[in-house]
């Protein structure tokens, strides 16, 4: 009979930030009796999740990919956004061999170039400056027939801000005398990550075949028509600009999103010869270029390949022969697996995974509890098994519902998670385990932009809480002294394991 483990649990409450301001703060306004009791009883602090503290430029807000990379790496991880930003500053971007080769191919073979991606300054999945730079590269290389397929945001930025970004892009096009915006669609359709292929189909048919629900005279007109229909940027339906434009065999497609999770499905639709998501009709092969590595087995040209991270938490524990469980609902499954493991898709030896399906609803404000209770049931069952040295669990609610901008729904999401915390605490207490609770970034603590008084759907730069739940006595680092890169070393300290040299983060706990 196998011995029972002294299980440690890392709970990641996605989007659960901290703000002193209680107005329009879903976390402060919610009934959180369990959370309040944990804060009053156990060592707690605040840690950083944005900007240079997580490998991003300046005051750039954090996000789930960045957060989980830092959580698992135990060091500040230089992000793709930062790598590309730096190369834009020093000019290396325009010398990128993969991008240059794709443009040369188009010129040599008289093929069109299609640039697609999320157009905003949100900086979570993409940045408008990088799309502008790609357009400039086509101009420098004398490319003809350059088409732009725009994904509108409204999630990592204001809900109705698309016009601002379109105007800047059109100004750049005029300056360079190149490029034409031929289609426009909201990210809700083009950037699904939850296998809702019916959404991706709208984006694919728009870009590949020029098949759209609506036709507009210009990109700005497309946005005006969408607003008149009651849509915000995230949900703008497929629209062709001036006349339908389709992709021809051998055309170059460049996807300018750098974050993998919401780029994978649209990439599959354009590149997988055995694609099963929906009927594409006759498959049109293209020269598809990924800005970053969305998935290793795609075997596609990648402008910015991933940098390998050695001795991330999962691999380090695996090498020590320890057991671990990763558990989340669909929306955050990639984060507790692929991203937490430093961009490695395959599970490490001794690592098991449990996926709880996210509810099939149009938007999560319609079901704020999402699958939190099913997730909790599965988590408690695995806690009680005492099979694992470490369990890492993500609750998606406060981020995914927070993105809706609906305060009442987000309060319900917070309260659902709080109820689950009570159940999990009892299970961990019963086995004598220890629990570290934190978040990857803020969101739900700011539902209105205080400067504009508009609905706020994006992440924040606020710190996030950290609570150490244990019968052991410990001092915790003062608020503002730690960051997400310190969490893996802290977990190792809880397990009485020395951290590897690669982990430059520090334990935030001092045991008495």
UniProtKB/Swiss-Prot annotation:
It comes from the Bacteria. Mn(2+) 1 binds at residues 399, 403, 459. Its cofactor is Mn(2+). One of its GO terms (biological process) is glucose catabolic process. It catalyses: (2R)-2-phosphoglycerate = (2R)-3-phosphoglycerate. It is an enzyme of class 5 (isomerase). Binds 2 manganese ions per subunit. This is 2,3-bisphosphoglycerate-independent phosphoglycerate mutase. The lineage of its organism: Bacteria, Pseudomonadati, Pseudomonadota, Gammaproteobacteria, Candidatus Pseudothioglobaceae. The gene is gpmI.
């Amino acid at each position: 009979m196998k011995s029972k483990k002294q299980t440690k649990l890392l709970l990641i409450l996605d989007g659960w930030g901290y703000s002193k301001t209680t107005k329009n703060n879903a976390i402060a306004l919610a009934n959180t009796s369990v959370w309040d009791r944990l804060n009053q009883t156990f060592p707690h602090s605040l840690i950083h999740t944005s900007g240079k503290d997580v490998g991003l430029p300046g005051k750039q807000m954090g996000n789930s990919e960045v957060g989980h990379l830092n959580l698992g790496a135990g060091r500040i991880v230089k992000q793709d956004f930062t790598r590309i930003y730096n190369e834009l500053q020093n000019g290396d971007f325009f010398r990128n061999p993969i991008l240059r080769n794709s443009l040369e191919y188009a010129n040599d073979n008289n093929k069109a170039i299609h640039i697609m991606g999320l157009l905003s300054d949100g900086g979570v999945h993409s940045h408008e400056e990088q799309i502008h730079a790609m357009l400039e590269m086509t101009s420098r290389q004398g490319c003809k027939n350059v088409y732009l397929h725009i994904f509108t945001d409204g999630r990592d930025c204001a809900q109705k801000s698309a016009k601002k970004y379109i105007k800047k892009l059109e100004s750049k096009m005029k300056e360079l005398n190149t490029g034409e915006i031929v289609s426009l669609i909201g990210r809700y359709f083009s950037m699904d990550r939850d296998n809702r292929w019916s959404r991706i189909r709208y984006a694919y048919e728009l870009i590949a075949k020029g098949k759209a629900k609506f036709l507009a005279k210009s990109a700005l007109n497309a946005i005006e028509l969408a607003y008149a229909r009651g849509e915000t940027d995230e949900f703008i339906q497929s629209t062709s600009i001036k006349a339908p434009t389709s992709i021809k065999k051998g055309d170059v497609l460049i996807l300018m999103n750098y974050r993998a999770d919401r780029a994978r499905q649209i990439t599959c639709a354009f590149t997988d010869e055995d694609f099963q998501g929906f009927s594409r009709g006759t498959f049109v092969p293209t020269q598809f270029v990924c800005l970053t590595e969305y998935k290793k087995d795609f075997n596609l040209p990648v402008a910015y390949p991933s940098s390998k991270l050695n001795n991330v938490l999962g691999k380090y524990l695996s090498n020590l022969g320890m057991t671990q469980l990763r558990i989340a609902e669909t929306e955050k499954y990639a984060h507790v697996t692929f991203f937490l493991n430093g961009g490695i898709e395959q599970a490490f030896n001794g690592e098991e995974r449990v996926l709880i399906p996210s509810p099939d609803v149009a938007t999560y404000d319609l079901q704020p509890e999402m699958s939190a209770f099913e997730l909790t049931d599965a988590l408690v069952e695995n806690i009680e098994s005492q099979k694992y040295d470490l369990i890492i669990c993500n609750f998606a609610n406060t981020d995914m519902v927070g993105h809706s901008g609906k305060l009442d729904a987000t309060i319900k999401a917070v309260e659902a998670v709080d109820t689950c915390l009570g159940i999990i605490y009892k299970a961990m207490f019963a086995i004598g385990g220890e629990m570290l609770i934190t978040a990857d970034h803020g969101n739900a603590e700011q539902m209105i932009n205080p400067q504009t008084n508009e609905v706020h759907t994006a992440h924040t730069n606020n710190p996030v809480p950290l609570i150490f739940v244990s019968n052991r006595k410990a001092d915790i680092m003062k608020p503002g002294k730690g960051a997400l890169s310190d969490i893996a070393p802290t977990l190792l300290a809880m397990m009485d394991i020395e951290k590897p040299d690669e982990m430059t983060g520090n334990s935030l706990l001092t045991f008495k």
